[in-house]
Amino acid sequence: MPKPFAIHPGEILLTEFMEPLDLTIYRLAKEIGVPLPRINDVVKGRRSISADTALRLGIFFGLPAQFWLNLQNDYDLRLASTNTLSKIKPYKAA
């Protein structure tokens, strides 16, 4: 069974939010008060969106922080889905 298709939330941040608004990584990091490497790593898919980052992005873009955390959780769950999980059988009480 192939891995489910997973899009890193950083890619969504870049293509759906930053690019349409002509926001640079530098500008976004400055506006939300985080170090530039944090946003750079998120956009490059090398870092997860933390609760702190989700809160800041939520305020800046006018969305609930939960939106960003849901993107991250969905991505993490899709990556965690593997063939070995299919071997686990639900427990049945005797």
Locate predicted features.
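The alpha-helix within a helix-turn-helix
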Residues: 18, 29, 58
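Short, charged recognition helix plus adjacent turn
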Residues: 69-94
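Short alpha-helical DNA-recognition segment
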Residues: 23-41
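A short, Lys/Arg-rich alpha-helix, primarily the initiator
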Residues: 1-23
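A contiguous, mid-protein "functional segment" used to position or interact
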Residues: 56-76
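Short, basic-rich loop-to-helix N-cap that marks the start of a DNA-contacting helix
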Residues: 46-59
